[in-house]
Amino acid sequence: MKDDFVIYNETDFYIKPYQDDFNAIFQKIKTLLAITEPLELSLIIVDAQEQLELNQKYRHKDYVADVITFALEEENKIDLFELTGLRSLGDIFICYEKALAQAAEYNHSPRREFAFLFTHGMLHILGYDHQTPADEEKMFNLQRKVLNDLQINRIPIK
């Protein structure tokens, strides 16, 4: 069975230039983590208002987050893998306005920022976090490896 990785764009922002990167990151993370079972994952591009509403409703936070993840595996009572043949990971929401603003703030390309946010979100949804220094080092090293291997580098914009 094949992976079911779907990108939904709920905005007018033109996301097509980033789709190849999202697919490459998805595959690179599977390879690096030796994930062999087929995965199901949704990436949803939203605007600031929708991201704020998601953050308020589900995380009780009153700000626009750059990326929010909703992992199915940690809350699932039934084994969806047995039902579907797919390991259902959940949903990653990226706020395109926040991504563009952060790219400008950090003086690198929107491509790099979208790739970073998707990588960060996918690692979170797979159980990685940065709550302790050791966990942070592990997660951030993996993020750097994914982006470096795909040559999506932090090149300053002039």
Curated annotation (Swiss-Prot):
It comes from the Bacteria. Pfam families: YbeY. Its main location: cytoplasm. GO terms for molecular function: metalloendopeptidase activity; RNA endonuclease activity; zinc ion binding. SUPFAM superfamilies: Metalloproteases ('zincins'), catalytic domain. Its cofactor is Zn(2+). Binds 1 zinc ion. InterPro entries: MetalPrtase_cat_dom_sf_prd (IPR023091), YbeY (IPR002036), YbeY_CS (IPR020549). Its EC number is 3.1.-.-. The keyword Phosphoprotein does not apply. Zn(2+) binds at H120, H124, H130. HAMAP family: Endoribonucl_YbeY. Single strand-specific metallo-endoribonuclease involved in late-stage 70S ribosome quality control and in maturation of the 3' terminus of the 16S rRNA. This is Endoribonuclease YbeY. The lineage of its organism: Bacteria, Bacillati, Mycoplasmatota, Mollicutes, Entomoplasmatales. The gene is ybeY.
